[in-house]
Regions:
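Conserved ABC ATPase signature
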Residues: 138-142, 146-148
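Helix-to-loop junction immediately C-terminal to a conserved catalytic motif
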Residues: 51-52
């Protein structure tokens, strides 16, 4: 399997303070990996560097999907982000638009123009997450777990090689959280690389996979 993320001796800062130092790890195509650590340990900051939301002040190498983050021009950032699917714990769906309209909005914003292609892609991603029969529902009509499935569908729209899931079960009950993690593992089996940040070690025990740990400003594998 090819390596799609390669960090070597990277330093990560927030508000001009080092949160992680000497970060070195790789992530391969189709790999599922947990990112664990206490609140404030640097999990989210590390993820944000991967889609250029947080700049990397120094490092030997920081490559994501063929993009050199240490020398990435601002105009290239949208091209990087189109190759990455991002899943947050707080859903961030447009509340005044249906599921279909939420997904259609993203596709049009990222350059899709043919109506049939758009509708076909929406059907594909909703089927993949088990939400094909809820496409005309409004977000407030969905449970938390259903909303998170829509968020994952949204992350899949542009066929990303990498999905970053930042505490995707944080606002869900345990049973629903298990369903979401099962879905993410299925997506990894289908070829997507998944990096999932969580502080829920029970999930890590119940769904074993590789674990990266953030602690004391260090990342250990």
């Amino acid at each position: 399997m090819s390596v799609i993320v390669d960090y070597r001796n990277v330093e990560i800062e927030r508000a001009e303070k080092t949160v992680l130092k000497n970060v070195s790890f790789t992530l391969s195509e189709g790999e599922f990996c947990y990112l664990v650590g206490r609140v404030g340990s640097g999990k989210s900051s590390l993820m944000k560097t991967m889609y250029a939301d947080v700049a990397i002040p120094s490092g030997e190498k920081a490559d994501v999907l063929g993009f050199d983050l240490l020398n990435l021009k601002k105009r290239r950032i949208p091209y990087l982000r189109r190759k990455i699917g991002i899943v947050f714990q707080d859903f961030q769906l447009l509340q005044d638009r249906s599921v279909n309209e939420n997904l259609r909005f993203v596709l049009r914003a990222t350059g899709w123009s043919q109506r049939q292609d758009i509708e076909d892609r929406i059907e594909e991603v909703l089927t993949a997450v088990g939400m094909a029969n809820k496409s005309y529902k409004m977000p407030h009509e969905l449970s938390g777990g259903e909303q998170q499935r829509v968020v994952i569908a949204r992350a899949l729209l542009n066929k990303p090689a990498l999905i970053l899931a930042d505490e995707p079960t944080g606002h869900l009950d345990p049973e629903t959280g298990y369903q979401i993690v099962t879905l993410l593992h299925t997506l990894a089996h289908d070829g997507h690389s998944i990096l999932m940040a969580t502080h829920n070690l029970q999930l890590v025990d119940d769904f074993p996979a590789r674990v990266l740990r953030c602690a004391d400003k260090n990342l250990s594998d």
